[in-house]
Amino acid sequence: MPRGPMGGRRAVEEPHDFGKVMGKLVNYCRNYLPVIIIALILGAAGTVCQIVGPDKLKDMTNEIVKGLPAIVNGRPVMNSVDFGTVGHIAWTLVALYVGYAVLGYVQSWMMANVTQRTAQRLRESISVKINKLPLKYFDKVSYGDVLSRITNDVDAIGQTLGQSLGSLITSVTLFVGALVMMFYNNVIMTLCAIGASLIGLIIMMAIMKSSQKYFARQQMALGDVNGHVEEMYAGHLIVKAYNGEADSIRRFEKYNSDLYESGWKSQFLSGLMMPLMNFVGNFGYVVVCVVGAALALDGQIEFGVIVAFMMYIRLFTQPLSQFAQAFQNLQRCAAAAERVFGFLEEPEMEDESDKSALLGTNGHEVKGDVEFSHVQFGYEPGKPIIHDFSASVSAGQKVAIVGPTGAGKTTMVNLLMRFYEISGGSISIDGVDTKSVPRWNVHDQFSMVLQDTWVFRGTVRENIAYSKPGVTNKQIEDACKAVGLDHFIRSLPDGYDTVLDDKSSLSQGQKQLLTIARAMVQDAPILILDEATSSVDTRTEELIQKAMDALTVGRTSFVIAHRLSTIRDADMILVMNHGDVIERGTHDELLAAGGFYADLYNSQFALAD
């Protein structure tokens, strides 16, 4: 029973440490490293095929030029061309480029497989992590932000990691290989090409440095937008009831504006890379042609070298743009990975694998004796809200906890079920300290009907028998009859096999009845009713109350309700205020005492009486 999705917002994070985050990601992918290495080797091998191609084209060009010693009647004489050699070179070129295409395809397939498996593992890790986080984490982080990490951030990793790594390796290989081949063919032309490209490289590095912070801000702003939209959608009735549309729109516009500001800046700077590299490449073509022509006229190089250099200058500048794009994608990947790993590294609940399940084991059923002894608790250190709570509840008793908002009623039930850990004192069930057994063993002893109803996508049967194996159809139907829901369910198109979800056209009262039927089917020794009838009409409340009276027989039950009419028959009423029990007793005893409870009761029923 956490305090809700608007319990807090995540603080603005500092720009991430790129190397540290990528190191974590590599470590997370360590099981796939052999496949990644093979894929990168294949990509590098394909790039080598691409690099060798222009050199072979140079040889082919030179062979053809050698066969053109003179021009006769304005036409080239082709008799001296060695077509055998030219054909052999041509087939070699075909083999090289086919090899380049095949190796590139295999590399892309392998990297796509690895990155999607990594994304799958990340989602699974997040899903497991959610169940290990204490509820206090969700008091300070919006649900929308967590959803953003599961969807947007993991998708960003899956989309960018494989492409970025592959492009990075092939770009480096292509850059180095083209540089080596250019020096091999002609040093002067190579130095001219490097000089033409150096300008673009300097500008590229400056842009990458500037854009990194905007990618991190973009991911942060996206989480804020998702969090706000999720909260407003979940609470849209409250927003309308309180005329909060203007405030909601104002907040959304602020978050959306932040996303726009960081988004356009990161995309604009990233988008500068391609036109910049195209300019550098075209400028390099001009330099190569001019210098190459001068050297050819001087007899220092063959014509084929110019042809090869025109291709090599493209292969030399292309990696610069690819490298820039790959690094930009890695920055986006790192920004998303930092948020995902930040979530995965959040402190978890204490590992309890070494604790024995002492409740309801070895054939000994839990009776339901509950003891609170000097319990203390606070959501924040140094800010206690439960100061010194003590109470003894015998098995089968119906205990009502009442008090004003913020008195600590729901908090006490949260502590009883170990949703939160107490700061002092102890809570025991049948004499067993709840901290000495695993949480799941404590949870098994409770059935719950919460203030906020919950229906998941599935049939009516599946909803009622949630997480309870072995439930028979008769048990489900009997529970629905007990709460007066059977007739309505049978009127549905498929009866108990009708598929429901959270958007199903069930009234709030019907959802409440369904959750009560679910609690009946669980058949746990202790029952928790948190505002169980606060969302239904008087007639439905009466039906529910009768069903609850039958359900609570022989079971320990804790009822939290503002409607005091539902707790008149309670065996014990605990009146709380400011985290302390200020009164306790039966309904008649508390009325006779004329204290806080009597004032509260009289304020509700004076007119009715």
Residues covered by each model-derived region:
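Helix-loop-helix
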Residues: 181-195, 265-338, 343-344
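An intracellular "coupling" helix at the cytosolic face of ABC transporter transmembrane type-1 domains
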Residues: 31, 135-136, 152-161, 165, ...
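Transmembrane helix-loop-helix hairpins at lipid-water interfaces of multipass membrane proteins
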Residues: 36-103, 183-188, 299-303
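ABC-type nucleotide-binding domain
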Residues: 358-609
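Short intracellular "coupling" helices and adjacent cytoplasmic loop segments at the cytosolic face
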Residues: 3-13, 116, 124-148, 152-154, ...
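Alpha-helical segments in transporter systems
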Residues: 23-26, 34-59, 93, 108-112, ...
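Transmembrane helices of ABC transporter permease
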Residues: 31, 35-48, 163-217, 288-301, ...
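Juxtamembrane loop-to-helix connectors within ABC transporter transmembrane domains
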Residues: 20-21, 29, 111-112, 131-175, ...
